[in-house]
Amino acid sequence: MEAAAAMEAGRKLAARHPHGRSRTAHNMSSSSLRKKSDAALVRKVPVAPLRPLLANLQEVFLATKLAVLFPAVPLAIAAQCFRFDQVWVFALSLLGLIPLAERVSFLTEQIALYTGPTVGGLLNATCGNATELIIALFALLKGKIEVVKCSLLGSVLSNLLLVLGTSLFCGGVVNLGARQPYDRNQSDVSTALLFLAVLCHSAPLLLRYAVAAGEHSVSATSAAASLDLSRACSFVMLASYVAYLFFQLKTHRQLFEPQEVDGGDAGDDDEEPALGFASALFWLALMTAVISVLSEYVVGTIEPTSQSWGLSVSFISIILLPIVGNAAEHAGAIIFALKNKLDITLGVALGSATQISMFVVPLSVLVAWIMGVQMDLDFKLLETGSLFMAVLVTAFTLQDGTSHYLKGILLLLCYIVIGACFFVARQPAGHANSNGALLDVPTGSMSVQAA
């Protein structure tokens, strides 16, 4: 039986790795949303050969608190096939991505239990933000460069301000009158990498303004120089992320281990694989394929939805996509904050923001280069300024190693202000990119539409 084999493999792995867990804070956000599967129900099935398959299906689709959202997946596909209103396709696809993203995180954790902490960490680095990466790739294929930029920027802002702010606020309210301590080592590393990301985003922007002001000149056009600089910075960012992974998985692994869980709710049972290795790989590939389908629907329907809802594409990409697309991970971070496990919460929020900034964004630039799409790191003035202020506020908030609800409120208010900026900002009519796709962000400053 596969279930028995998985449990036996779990016991062997526990004996082989008594201290070095392959679980990261990112995986553990999915663990907080898991629920026990009903083994007794499977045993009642009269046909014995079907029991392993049904147990597998139950673990994948029903052993999560988000199982109620799975019907949105076939509904989104049906809405697209039967040519329903594109707003319905967009909304159902977003809802369907919520449980799929949580299941990808769960399946990554299952595979990591077999492969060990190093390979598991690398797998998490690749699949941890699979939804954002897949949406970015489909947007690049359709030439919607600004959708790529805004969605990735929105994921970073959402993790730094919305997720972290909500977590600190909820944790502070539950622990009213007391401060919640956390280990600063992990947050210091993450914020340093985020400041490097801000520098790499600012360099092409500053170069463009310096050339436009006549203070400096370049051998090619300003756009070509900015593109070359962006690609060079992308290599620097990826090299920094590789160094960060080596630091996290090899030399300083103890800084990133969620020690609070060892004696807490996530007991030893969570260390035993719930699925076999082959099954986990199969379901991971299948879930990724379904995410690709829904991501294509989201990218293809975002502009009609923008017109129908009266919202700019930049607002939907920066605010709505990250909130809904990462809802499972966000909920996990908040749950751990409520349990006074802020180190795991910081690992989820800061880890995801770092992963997107230092891995997904530069990878998107280089993939666009291979595809012949001219995507740079110049996210324009409002976007880059918002990123800088978000990183700066987060760094100051986390500098003393303790938290209370007021810090959460301040982070949330910063997120509201940034969201309001993109709500009122619009692109001048008729602006298009080199591929002919309408963009929501102009080359220079943004304009504000009158109500």
From Swiss-Prot:
The chain crosses the membrane at residues 59-79, 87-107, 121-141, 154-174, 192-212, 229-249, 274-294, 318-338, 353-373, 379-399, 405-425. Keywords: Antiport, Calcium, Calcium transport, Ion transport, Membrane, Transmembrane, Transmembrane helix, Transport, Vacuole. Changing residue 154 to A: Loss of transport of Ca(2+) and Mn(2+). Vacuolar cation/proton exchanger (CAX). Translocates Ca(2+) and other metal ions into vacuoles using the proton gradient formed by H(+)-ATPase and H(+)-pyrophosphatase. GO terms for molecular function: calcium:proton antiporter activity. Changing residue 128 to A: Reduced transport of Ca(2+) and loss of transport of Mn(2+). It comes from the Eukaryota. This is Vacuolar cation/proton exchanger 1a. Changing residue 132 to Q: Loss of transport of Ca(2+) and Mn(2+). It comes from Oryza sativa subsp. japonica. Ubiquitous. One of its GO terms (biological process) is calcium ion transmembrane transport. Belongs to the Ca(2+):cation antiporter (CaCA) (TC 2.A.19) family. Cation/proton exchanger (CAX) subfamily. Residues 1-58, 108-120, 175-191, 250-273, 339-352, 400-404 are cytoplasmic. Residues 128-163, 325-360 are annotated as: Cation selection. Residues 80-86, 142-153, 213-228, 295-317, 374-378, 426-451 are vacuolar. One of its GO terms (cellular component) is plant-type vacuole membrane. It is a multi-pass membrane protein. It is found in: Vacuole membrane. Coiled coil: none annotated. Changing residue 329 to D/Q: Loss of transport of Ca(2+) and Mn(2+). Residues 9-37 are annotated as: Disordered. Residues 13-24 have a biased composition (Basic residues).
